[in-house]
């Protein structure tokens, strides 16, 4: 009888330890399983993000190639074209000192000319604006082009933004700051003999929450200052929803 009691006592004393070891093993298995699942999820997320980055890179490169071609088209064909009757009926409005607005039927773009210029620059601005009306007709994000004219050192700004309203309204200083900044960049590049093409860092148009970068191209002209053509190329439409962007200005 005493031996049976001793055996039963030993069995019950070992039972709690067995349960503890079982649960410890179960917890370890669960942790390992969760770790594998988390690692698999992280790897899938990283793979998806890497594919997105590759797609964005290809899209940006395609955009650069397209607008590099447009830059040459504008300089070689649009800006250089002359027509005896192209300037008939053209009008410009002086918004303030050395800032002129090209009057044209309201289409996709508006144009400003900064600095003294002659009628040939006005005609050239009208041709470039009409050309960009076609290219930007279906676009919903802001696009802008700057043309630093080596012939008279004027600066032409053509944009899908409402330039006349912005220049006359409370954002006047912002537009002036952007134009002054672009002119300084373009003049610097025009004087850099070894730099034909350059890119800016990513920028942000604050009131539109639009991110973009600037493509600048220099064209040297014997006997004149260099002409520089710059495009602000938006990237918001190339970025997947939910992907954060920097806050550069």
Task: Name what the model sees in each region.
Residues 125-139, 222-249:
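Solvent-exposed, extracytoplasmic
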Residues 15-115:
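Juxtamembrane extracytoplasmic/periplasmic/luminal helical "stalk" adjacent to the first N-terminal
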């Amino acid at each position: 009888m005493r031996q049976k009691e001793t055996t039963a006592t030993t069995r019950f004393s070992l039972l709690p330890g067995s349960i503890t070891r079982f649960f410890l093993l179960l917890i370890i298995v669960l942790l390992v399983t969760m770790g594998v699942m988390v690692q698999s999820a992280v790897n899938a997320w990283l793979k998806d993000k890497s594919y997105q980055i590759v797609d964005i890179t290809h899209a940006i490169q395609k955009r650069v190639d397209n607008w590099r071609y447009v830059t040459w088209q504008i300089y070689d064909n649009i800006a250089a074209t002359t027509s005896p009757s192209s300037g008939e009926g053209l009008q410009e409005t002086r918004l303030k000192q050395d800032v002129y607005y090209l009057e044209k039927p309201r289409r996709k773009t508006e144009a400003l000319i900064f600095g003294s210029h002659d009628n040939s620059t006005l005609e050239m601005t009208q041709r470039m604006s009409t050309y960009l009306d076609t290219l930007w007709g279906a676009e919903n994000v802001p696009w802008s082009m700057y043309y630093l004219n080596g012939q008279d050192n004027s600066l032409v700004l053509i944009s899908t933004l409402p330039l006349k309203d912005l220049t006359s309204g409370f954002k006047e200083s912002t537009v002036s700051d952007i134009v002054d900044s672009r002119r300084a960049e373009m003049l610097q590049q025009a004087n850099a003999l070894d730099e034909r093409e350059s890119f800016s860092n990513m920028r942000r148009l604050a009131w539109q929450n639009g991110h973009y970068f600037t493509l600048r191209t220099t064209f040297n002209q014997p006997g004149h200052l260099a002409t520089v053509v710059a495009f602000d190329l938006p990237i918001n439409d190339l970025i997947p929803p939910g992907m954060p962007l920097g806050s550069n200005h």
